[in-house]
Amino acid sequence: MTTTTRFAPAPETEAGSMSMFAALLAVAVMVMAGVVWDGSTRMRDANKAAYAATEAGRAASQAISAEAIAGRDADIDPSAGAVAARRYLAAAGVAGTVAVSGQRVIITTSVTWTPTFVPTGSQTMTGRAEARTVRT
């Protein structure tokens, strides 16, 4: 004699279903992940603009005039300083403006940020830096 064991079939109403809570939780987690991702890329691009402005200002302020080497005012050579700053910005892939005046250089940069998940549209992140030469 052979015995067979039979299991009761699952009720038809529960086949392949998931709770409403689990579905809403999954959607909420995906939305939060998208917001975190887009927030981090926005901060990255804002930092890129600020860092590029700072470093371009440093590059420009190193282009001092020949009179500064001779011991007079530590003025920045306007053409050499602007060229050095623009070269740095081009190498960094950042758009920007350069203004050199006497011992000061002002750099303004802009980076376009485009979100990946949140449909808010592109935004421009700007950075601004001012560098001065100081005789010590």
What are these regions (language model features)?
Residues 3-5, 115-136:
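Low-complexity, S/T/G/P-rich flexible repeat/linker segments used as non-globular hinges
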Residues 2-76:
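Alpha-helical assembly-interface signal, strongest on the long, hydrophobic N-terminal helix that forms
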Residues 23-33, 99-112, 132-136:
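Hydrophobic transmembrane alpha-helix bundles
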Residues 38, 112, 120:
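Residue-level signal for pocket-adjacent positions within structured domains
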Residues 22, 46, 79, 86, ...:
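Alpha-helix boundary/capping detector
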Residues 59-111:
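Short amphipathic secondary-structure patches
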Residues 10-17, 106-115:
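Short secondary-structure transition/capping segments
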